A protein has these predicted regions:
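Intrinsically disordered, low-complexity regulatory tails/linkers
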Residues: 1-107
Length: 107
């Protein structure tokens, strides 16, 4: 029997694109995927700074273990854009991970 699957979105500022907000979405299947592997793939695809890998993996993992929370906002290790002070509400120096159920268990 197939279990639930989730859609996870990492929302953060992209310094390479005029500091625009960027949503990176991917599917997550418990038992098949892991937060560590997904975060590493984001770094390898140059979508995430390597110094943020462990933070993103940890926050994804926390959200996966409690999907009812729906989202988590956390400070990044990578610095915000030059001259920009960290602002949590605007995700300057912060990132947000969101999760939603896309597939329910099939009996």
């Amino acid at each position: 029997p197939a279990g639930p699957s989730y859609r996870i979105t990492l929302r953060k500022r992209n310094l390479k694109q005029n500091n625009e907000l960027q949503d990176i979405s991917f599917n997550y299947v418990p038992g098949k995927d892991s937060a560590d592997v997904l975060a590493r793939e984001l770094v390898e695809a140059d979508l995430l700074d390597g110094c943020d890998l462990l933070l993103v993996a940890h926050n994804m993992s926390e959200l996966i273990s409690n999907p009812a929370a729906r989202e988590r906002v956390f400070p990044l290790n990578s610095p915000p854009a030059p001259g920009q002070v960290p602002v949590e509400s605007e995700l300057h120096g912060y990132a947000k991970v969101l999760i939603r159920l896309v597939g329910s268990p099939v009996p």
